[in-house]
Structure formats: structure tokens, C-alpha cells
Amino acid sequence: MGQTDDAGVVERYLACLAVHDWDGLAATIADEDLIREGPYCDVIEGKQRYLKFLRGVCASPEGYRLDVHRISHASDRVCYVELSETFEADGVPTEYPECLVLEQNPDGLINRVSVFIKQVRS
């Protein structure tokens, strides 16, 4: 197909994200036409801007942890990922459940990341 082994791109992206391996993560995302849509309707366009955003967000919080609960490959180019991000708020580990929609371009690289926050039941 393209430049990458499609079957493992999403899994490698998540593994690199969890350990803050930005060079490894960069190898899983498209150089062109990358768009990240956040849970608050925020949009980041471009590979370098997205990597800069991740470096700032993921490296800062105390006690940061990413746990992947389920990966569902809807097609050869679309994947849903249920995960949780945990970091300390006032010294207390706080978990934030999310769902990501990841889309891959014809070369197998991730070119679209959409982030949805799950609502915690009261």
C-alpha cells in the first residue's frame, strides 16, 4: 500500500503517545493535511503544530497516564479508540474518559484526530 504498515499505525500512535515518544508518534501521522479537532471545538492544523500541542499538554500534568481500553477498527482507514487520561488535580489522580476517532490517509498515516470527552455518570 503506502509508506507504513497500516495494521499497526494506530497502535504505534497510542503507544508513543503514552510514553511521550514524539519522534515515534511523528512517524505515524501525515506530513500534509493533518487536522486535530478537540472536545471543545478547537482545531489544530498541521503536523508540527499538533506535535507542539501534544508536547505542551502531555508533558506538563503531574502523574500523567494514558490507558487504552478498546480499539475498534471500523474500516481500513477509520478507527475508534476508547481511552482514559489520568493526571493529578490538587494531588488527587483524576481520570478523564475519552473516545478518539482516528482516520488514515491512503498512505496509511493518521491525518485526522477527533477527540470526544465521555460524560461521567452522576
Language model features with spans:
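Short, low-complexity N-terminal intrinsically disordered segments enriched in polar/charged residues
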Residues: 1-28, 32, 122
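A beta-strand edge to alpha-helix "cap/lid" segment located at domain peripheries
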Residues: 2-5, 51-122
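A solvent-exposed, acidic/Ser-Thr-rich amphipathic alpha-helical stretch
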Residues: 23-27, 31-71
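Generic alpha-helical hydrophobic packing signal
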Residues: 10-11, 23-26, 43, 49, ...
